[in-house]
């Protein structure tokens, strides 16, 4: 029996990682085998992408182009899909992924890349059974990022986050598997909303 593939998406600070863990625990309590994963992955390629994002100068001393960045994300995703996601699904596991190709579309579209090109680059990636968009106002996102102590270049981040949030909401209109959850609620209420979605959309409960 094929498993379920669930993705959590949202702008920085929206609580994706926390909610992915809580959802994994919920499924495990119900007796399901669960694979909790993320993108970029922990592979060598995924680590390289994180270095590029953080340092922006690891290739030749200058920032790589957004096109090259998009292709690196897609390469990491291709490995992730073939070696981790599809095998787990074929074993009947529930795969919960913290970020997926929607992140590439939302962020790299915000940086000026062509959306249709980005969709084509990621066309190999199977669509999940359910993609949950944790929607959060940019002001609250920035407050949470500040609390983590990871906020730099404030003005640039504000503008990027605005564009990314707008893009995510557009993607929710384009992709029927995507559902929106209000990420301003408490952790517990958000989890309850996600569980309700899973029960309705996937489990028929």
Curated annotation (Swiss-Prot):
GO terms for biological process: dTDP biosynthetic process; dTTP biosynthetic process; dUDP biosynthetic process. PROSITE patterns: THYMIDYLATE_KINASE. SUPFAM superfamilies: P-loop containing nucleoside triphosphate hydrolases. ATP binds at residues 10-17. One of its GO terms (molecular function) is ATP binding. InterPro entries: P-loop_NTPase, Thymidylate_kin-like_dom, Thymidylate_kin_CS, Thymidylate_kinase. It catalyses: dTMP + ATP = dTDP + ADP. Its EC number is 2.7.4.9. Keywords: ATP-binding, Kinase, Nucleotide biosynthesis, Nucleotide-binding, Transferase. CDD domains: TMPK. PANTHER family: THYMIDYLATE KINASE, UMP-CMP KINASE 2, MITOCHONDRIAL. This is Probable thymidylate kinase.
